[in-house]
C-alpha cells in the first residue's frame, strides 16, 4: 500500500448515480531525465494505448482515443467487470497486445487499433494494465490524492490473467529507470502522491521521463516487466 486505505464517505443514493459518458484524461508532462523524489510514485511507461474502463451495472465500456467501439477491437476484455470488486468504477490504464510468448507487441496492437482483424478475430492476447482509479462505487475520486486512489485501485482489482495493476515504487526513480532500461522499456512514469486527477496537462502531477534501453533492445514478457526486478 502507498498510504492508508481509502475510506469513502459513500452517499446512500450512490446506486442511482451514473458514471459520466466521457472523462477528459490527464496527460503527462515531459521531463528531461529520471529523478528521485519521495513525493512521487514511479512505474513503467507502458508501450500501449491509453484507455479508460467504465464498469457499471456489470457492463464494460471503454474510452480509447480514435476508437468508436474499443470493445469490438478488444472483445477478450468483456469480462473485466467480473474481476473488479466495485460497482460504478472508472479505471485509467493502458491496453497492450501480447504475442505468443507473452511479450508486448506494438504491431499487433496497431492492427487492433486499425480494425485489421478477420471476422472480428485478431492475433495476439490483449491485456489491460490499470494505473489509476477515477470513480469508485459511483463516487468521483478525482479530488482525492493519487496515493489514496492507487490504494483503492489495488483493493478493488485483484490480479487476473488479462487485467492487472502495475507495480511501482516511491522515491526510487533512477533505480526503477535502470531496471526498466534492462527490460527494453523506454519511458518512466512519475505521479505525485498528493496530486488530484485533472484533465489536460498534468504538470507536476504526472511526469514522463525518457529511458534509453541497450542495443539490441530486449523484449521481455509482460510477467517479467510486472515483477520489475531492481538491482
Model segments located where?
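Catalytic cores of nucleic-acid ligases and guanylyltransferases
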Residues: 1-231
Amino acid at each position: 500500500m502507498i498510504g492508508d486505505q481509502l475510506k469513502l464517505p459513500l452517499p446512500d443514493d450512490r446506486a442511482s448515480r451514473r458514471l459520466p459518458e466521457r472523462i477528459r484524461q490527464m496527460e503527462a508532462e515531459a521531463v528531461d531525465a529520471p529523478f528521485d523524489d519521495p513525493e512521487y510514485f514511479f512505474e513503467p511507461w507502458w508501450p500501449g494505448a491509453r484507455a479508460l474502463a467504465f464498469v457499471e451495472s456489470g457492463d464494460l465500456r471503454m474510452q480509447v482515443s480514435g476508437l468508436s467501439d474499443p470493445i469490438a477491437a478488444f472483445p477478450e476484455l468483456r469480462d473485466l467487470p467480473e474481476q473488479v470488486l466495485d460497482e460504478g468504477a472508472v479505471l485509467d490504464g493502458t491496453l497492450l497486445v501480447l504475442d505468443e510468448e507473452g511479450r508486448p507487441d506494438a504491431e499487433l496492437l496497431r492492427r487492433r487499433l486499425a480494425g485489421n482483424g478477420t471476422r472480428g478475430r485478431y492475433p495476439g492476447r490483449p491485456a489491460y494494465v490499470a494505473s489509476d482509479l477515477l470513480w469508485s462505487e459511483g463516487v468521483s475520486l478525482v479530488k482525492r490524492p493519487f496515493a489514496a486512489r492507487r490504494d483503492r485501485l489495488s483493493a478493488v482489482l485483484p490480479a487476473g490473467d488479462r487485467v492487472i495493476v502495475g507495480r511501482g515504487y516511491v522515491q526510487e526513480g533512477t533505480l526503477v529507470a535502470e531496471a526498466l532500461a534492462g527490460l527494453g522499456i523506454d519511458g518512466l512514469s512519475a505521479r505525485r502522491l498528493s496530486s488530484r486527477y485533472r484533465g489536460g496537462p498534468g504538470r507536476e502531477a504526472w511526469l514522463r521521463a525518457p529511458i534509453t534501453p541497450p542495443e539490441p533492445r530486449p523484449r521481455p514478457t509482460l510477467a517479467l516487466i510486472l515483477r520489475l526486478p531492481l538491482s
